[in-house]
Amino acid sequence: MEGIFYALIPMFTWGSIGFVSNKIGGKPSQQTLGMTFGALLFSLAVWLIVRPEMTLQLWLFGILGGFIWSIGQTGQFHAMQYMGVSVANPLSSGSQLVLGSLIGVLVFHEWTRPMQFVVGSLALLLLIIGFYFSSKQDDANAQVNHLHNFSKGFRALTYSTIGYVMYAVLFNNIMKFEVLSVILPMAVGMVLGAITFMSFKISIDQYVIKNSVVGLLWGIGNIFMLLAASKAGLAIAFSFSQLGAIISIVGGILFLGETKTKKEMRWVVTGIICFIVGAILLGVVKS
């Protein structure tokens, strides 16, 4: 039970990143740079307290992983801009879970028993249904929908998902480091990635500074993810953390004024239920 409680913290912190950053404002590049600055400050504070042993391998792969993560985050911020937070985030989380699970099964053979394939396939189907309904648009809401650019949003989500899944595979399947040890090199890579996406034209303005708060949310989520994994297992912790998409949907509607028709709200509730059940089943399969 304690592990589940810890897993709820990254669910709320990571789920809040999208609508908090969009409430602050700024371009996706400014949002990413500000977030990475906040993450770097948080990571430096953790390093000064913990003083973990640092190796060359840890630095190299940590920086590489952070750079790859920045691809995912920049794409997600672009998708939010084009599609809205309440649409982009559940699509992002769902596609990460589905693609990550398929890679785990096909490449790393994480499912070995028949029951895992049965329950796992059901979980993936529920996730696909969930993020389909959570992003489904009502024609009656055309006045709002025309303000969005869903084709650009889906393109941004494509490279965002690839970046996030590559990052997850690197740290979960290929290289296994302690979070408290790798968090500083990773934050350095995140900043380098954000600067690269700004074409090395760094401008520290109010949006960059304010978005550093979002980096603190990312850092707090990582710490509690570590605690949750130690108590309940990584699979359960990760699956629960991905339910942050629910927080994004609610936050986008309540705090960003993203309107939904009654029909869309019914679809959203259906999507959330499918998403919760699918993520929990996936965690059970992986554990």
Curated annotation (Swiss-Prot):
Top-level taxon of the source organism: Bacteria
Transmembrane segments: 4-26, 33-50, 55-72, 85-107, 117-134, 154-171, 181-200, 207-229, 234-256, 268-285
Cellular location(s): Cell membrane
Membrane topology: Multi-pass membrane protein
The keyword Magnesium appears for this protein: no
UniProt organism field: Streptococcus pyogenes serotype M6 (strain ATCC BAA-946 / MGAS10394)
Protein name stated in the entry: Putative sugar uptake protein M6_Spy1874
Lineage: Bacteria, Bacillati, Bacillota, Bacilli, Lactobacillales
Similarity field: Belongs to the GRP transporter (TC 2.A.7.5) family.
